[in-house]
Amino acid sequence: MFGRLGAPEIILILVVIILLFGAKKLPDMARSLGKSARILKSEAKAMKSEGQESTPAGPPNTDEQPPAQRTIQAAPGDVTSSRPVSEPTDTTKR
């Protein structure tokens, strides 16, 4: 579908985008999209590393300790601050 797009079609699409959003908003939108992509990439990497670190389920441990808190840090240049997040527990009420 996208393999048939030539230079005139791509230029037309870019002109329409500039007309819709305005030249002033495009850098902010690109910056926001870049931040979102970085966050998504770091979360996917964290999930992948958590999956590799996990061990097969064994007998339940009787000396349960509360799960360690993990801090999610903001992307560089982001105005939000870091906040602690508690990990979900694997226990369910039965």
From Swiss-Prot:
UniProt-annotated location(s): Cell membrane
Which InterPro entries does the UniProt record give?
TatA/B/E, TatA/E
Gene Ontology cellular-component terms for this entry are: TAT protein transport complex
Q: Give positions of region: Disordered.
A: 44-94
Q: Where is the composition biased (Polar residues)?
A: 62-72
Q: Name one GO molecular function term.
A: protein transmembrane transporter activity
Location, primary (coarse class): membrane
Query: What membrane topology does the annotation report for this chain?
Result: Single-pass membrane protein
Q: Which UniProt keywords apply?
A: Cell membrane, Membrane, Protein transport, Translocation, Transmembrane, Transmembrane helix, Transport
From the record, give the transmembrane residue ranges: 1-21
Q: List this protein's GO terms for biological process.
A: protein transport by the Tat complex
Q: Quaternary arrangement and interactors, per the entry?
A: The Tat system comprises two distinct complexes: a TatABC complex, containing multiple copies of TatA, TatB and TatC subunits, and a separate TatA complex, containing only TatA subunits. Substrates initially bind to the TatABC complex, which probably triggers association of the separate TatA complex to form the active translocon.
Name the family: Belongs to the TatA/E family.
Q: What does this protein do, in the record's words?
A: Part of the twin-arginine translocation (Tat) system that transports large folded proteins containing a characteristic twin-arginine motif in their signal peptide across membranes. TatA could form the protein-conducting channel of the Tat system.
How is this protein named in the record?
A: Sec-independent protein translocase protein TatA
